[in-house]
């Protein structure tokens, strides 16, 4: 019976909803109230009022405001995919900081929009100013 319950818990998608954001995880979701963080593994999905992100693993820091959890820093690991408006960002690693609304992706990065596909090894996406900086492996090339 115990093995059956563990199997069910491991296969269920865990979901925690907040006023503007949520985290889902296919394997595990660990809440650390002392350090105000979440660790998620397996088919991770994170959504806030700006974008939705998918990855194999996530570590998220939050702060409490009016009894609500507001995610301030979100790190995504492996097979990262971020959907923002009509664009899709992909990379090996991403970090989002709420203070400046910047997403930074590293490693095998791409930006896909309806009219183009750009690739590189680092992307800095300034959400508030609608600006993208894509760096390639060659230090001499830059796309803005």
State the predicted function of each range.
Residues 1-144:
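Mature-chain termini and adjacent capping regions
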């Amino acid at each position: 019976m115990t093995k059956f319950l563990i199997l069910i818990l491991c296969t269920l998608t865990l979901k925690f909803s907040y006023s503007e954001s949520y985290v889902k995880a296919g394997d595990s979701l660990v809440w650390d109230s002392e350090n105000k963080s979440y660790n998620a593994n397996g088919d991770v999905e994170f959504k806030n009022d700006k974008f939705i992100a998918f990855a194999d693993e996530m570590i998220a820091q939050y702060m409490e405001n009016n009894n609500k959890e507001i995610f301030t820093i979100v790190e995504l690991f492996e097979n990262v995919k971020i959907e923002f408006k009509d664009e899709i960002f992909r990379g090996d690693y991403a970090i989002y900081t709420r203070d400046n609304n910047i997403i930074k992706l590293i490693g095998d990065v791409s930006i896909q929009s309806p009219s183009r596909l750009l690739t590189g090894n680092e992307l800095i996406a300034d959400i508030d100013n609608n600006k993208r900086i894509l760096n390639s492996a060659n230090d001499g090339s830059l796309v803005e």
